[in-house]
């Protein structure tokens, strides 16, 4: 797939205008909809189907802050992420992440919905702060630091999913 920003004719930047993204998505889907190619050759039908799939994939990248940041870094550096290398470089954050997991375990054992809600709010606030820092670093073209924060966002995403699973368990009781 080609650059998702160029496919949607958007500037390569972290902040996205969601209304513009939706508008461009609908236009591209209309342009490459397989029904428009029903009377064309099999090759043209296949090409339209692939283009439609590329549009859908690009949309998912542009909508997800982690995937969008990763794409920006790869476009500007030509370097594909090495997840293991980043993890070794960010030991302080990994220690913090482990502490958050211990706190989540403690909250789960105490079965306190109120503590869990407060913890989720805290983690989402931390995540938003990292997203803001990431946007700044991307604008400043500090790719290596931005890549590190992108990895942090991956951890936040996983932690939030785990918190939501604990929340579901607590609601079942």
Curated annotation (Swiss-Prot):
Q: Which GO terms describe its cellular component?
A: iron-sulfur cluster transfer complex
Q: Does the keyword rRNA processing apply?
A: no
In this chain the J domain maps to 3-75
Which SUPFAM superfamilies does the annotation name? Chaperone J-domain (SSF46565), HSC20 (HSCB), C-terminal oligomerisation domain (SSF47144)
Q: Which InterPro entries match?
A: DnaJ_domain, HscB, HscB_C_sf, HscB_oligo_C, J_dom_sf
Q: GO biological process annotations for this chain's record?
A: [2Fe-2S] cluster assembly; protein complex oligomerization; protein folding
Q: Which domain of life is it from?
A: Bacteria
Keywords (A to Z) from UniProt:
Chaperone
Q: Does the keyword Chaperone apply?
A: yes
The record's annotation in Pfam families points to: HSCB_C (PF07743)
Q: What disulfide bonds does the UniProt entry report for this chain?
A: none
Give an example GO molecular function: protein-folding chaperone binding
Similarity remark: Belongs to the HscB family.
Q: How does it assemble?
A: Interacts with HscA and stimulates its ATPase activity.
Per the entry, what this protein does is: Co-chaperone involved in the maturation of iron-sulfur cluster-containing proteins. Seems to help targeting proteins to be folded toward HscA.
Under the heading PANTHER family, the entry gives: IRON-SULFUR CLUSTER CO-CHAPERONE PROTEIN HSCB
| Name assigned to this protein | Co-chaperone protein HscB homolog
């Amino acid at each position: 797939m080609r650059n998702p920003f160029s496919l949607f004719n958007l500037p390569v930047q972290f902040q996205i205008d969601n209304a513009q993204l939706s508008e461009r998505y609908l236009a591209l889907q209309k342009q490459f909809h397989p029904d428009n190619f029903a009377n064309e050759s099999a090759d043209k039908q296949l090409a339209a189907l692939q283009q439609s799939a590329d549009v859908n994939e690009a949309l998912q990248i542009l909508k997800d802050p982690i995937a969008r940041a990763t794409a920006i870094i790869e476009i500007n550096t030509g370097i594909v992420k090495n997840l293991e290398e980043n993890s070794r470089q960010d030991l302080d954050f990994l220690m913090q992440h482990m502490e958050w997991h211990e706190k989540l375990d403690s909250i789960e054992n105490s079965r306190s919905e109120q503590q869990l809600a407060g913890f989720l709010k805290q983690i989402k606030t931390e995540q938003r702060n990292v997203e803001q820092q990431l946007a700044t670093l991307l604008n400043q073209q500090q790719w290596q630091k931005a890549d590190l924060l992108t990895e942090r966002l991956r951890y936040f995403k996983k932690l939030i999913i785990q918190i939501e699973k604990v929340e579901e368990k607590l609601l079942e009781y």
